[in-house]
A protein has these predicted regions:
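C-terminal motif of bacterial Sec signal peptides marking the signal peptidase cleavage site
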Residues: 13-14
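Catalytic domains of carbohydrate-active enzymes, especially glycoside hydrolases
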Residues: 57-81
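Acidic-and-aromatic substrate-binding clefts and catalytic sites of carbohydrate-active enzymes
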Residues: 51-52, 74-85, 112-115, 127-130, ...
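Noncatalytic carbohydrate-binding groove/subsite architecture in carbohydrate-active enzymes
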Residues: 127, 158, 164-285
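Hydrophobic faces of well-ordered beta-strands that scaffold small-molecule active sites
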Residues: 37-41, 73-75, 102-106, 149-153, ...
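Boundary/entry segment of secreted carbohydrate-active catalytic domains
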Residues: 19-61
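Substrate-binding cleft of extracellular glycoside hydrolase catalytic domains
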Residues: 23, 78, 84-192
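Alpha-helical scaffolding within the catalytic cores
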Residues: 22-26, 60, 132-139, 200-216
Length: 285
């Protein structure tokens, strides 16, 4: 059965550069494992990505996340030094502390032609930029085999509300298949899982405008589906979601919050279930 995992934004054996001993955990051991909580990680201190956090800054963050129990982090792009510096920081922490454990879901940013301009071309890809992102993902997956366990092709690159950069599923599919071929020929570790990080609608759980043969083939081609759902952020479009019904007015503040959280969980599970239903109609294996 095709594995499906969701990221909720309601809350928020070889040698490599990172050491001589490759950790035994693979993607199949950590993804979906409650003992390996994951969190998306940016690490930026300023208002612009042009101001990059130092490796010292990143180490500070990693120690905090490790102390909180997180064991997997997700990054977003590779056209800034941040992702590689994060891998360097993890490697250095591992080498200085044998108890430190952290894995990475490495995001490769994929976008359409003329993204972030006044006239993005959504039916074409930014070929040169996307090639650089994928090449960097491959290089880092080779250099940090003990840390990089997942490569995610695109971050919310297919959902239509990403008006500045979204593109058609066929381009995500192309790069997913390319990476799967590299696993087969031994260029990258065969145990790395390949996916795409995207909104529930993009994975078939929304309207029929997203349903097409390329999406269906993408579902068959990824190692698992990484689905995003965000009860909090979605209320930008649906602010009445958090309005109190009359039967809650007499409850304590704690009970009101508890019911609001439960409502959000149910909201996210409904999106998960809609994607799961679509996926099982495509690939029941």
């Amino acid at each position: 059965m095709k594995k499906l995992f969701f990221i909720s934004f309601f809350l928020i054996a070889s040698c490599s550069k990172s050491g001589d001993l490759v950790m035994s955990k693979n993607a199949k051991d950590i993804i979906g494992n409650n003992n390996y909580p994951a969190i998306s990680y940016g690490g930026y201190r300023g208002k612009s990505r042009e101001v990059q956090p130092s490796i010292v800054d990143i180490k500070e963050d990693l120690k905090i996340m490790f102390a909180q129990g997180f064991r997997v982090i997700r990054t977003y792009d590779l056209h800034h030094p941040f992702a590689e510096n994060t891998l360097k920081a993890i490697s250095e922490l591992k080498n200085s502390d044998s108890d430190f454990e952290m894995y990475v879901m490495l995001g490769a940013w994929i976008q359409c032609k003329d993204a972030f301009t006044d006239v993005p071309i959504h039916n074409e890809e930014d070929l040169e930029g996307n090639k650089v992102e994928i090449a960097e993902a491959v290089r880092l997956a080779q250099d940090y085999q003990d840390i990089v366990k997942v490569i995610a092709v695109g971050n919310e690159a297919m959902v239509h509300w990403a008006t500045s950069y979204h593109l058609e599923p066929k381009y995500i599919l192309k790069w997913v298949k390319y990476l799967q071929d590299l696993k087969i020929n031994g260029t990258i570790n065969n145990n790395i899982w390949i996916t795409s990080s995207d909104n529930f609608a993009s994975w078939g759980g929304g309207s029929e405008e997203y349903h097409n043969d390329d999406l269906d083939e993408l579902i068959r081609s990824v190692d698992y589906v990484s689905m995003h759902t965000y009860a909090f952020h979605d209320t930008y479009y649906n602010p009445v979601f958090w309005n109190l019904s009359g039967d809650l007015e007499d409850l304590s503040k704690k009970d009101i919050i508890k019911k609001a959280i439960q409502k959000a969980v149910e909201y996210e599970l409904s999106q998960f279930n809609s994607v799961q239903e679509y996926i099982h109609g495509i690939d029941s294996s």
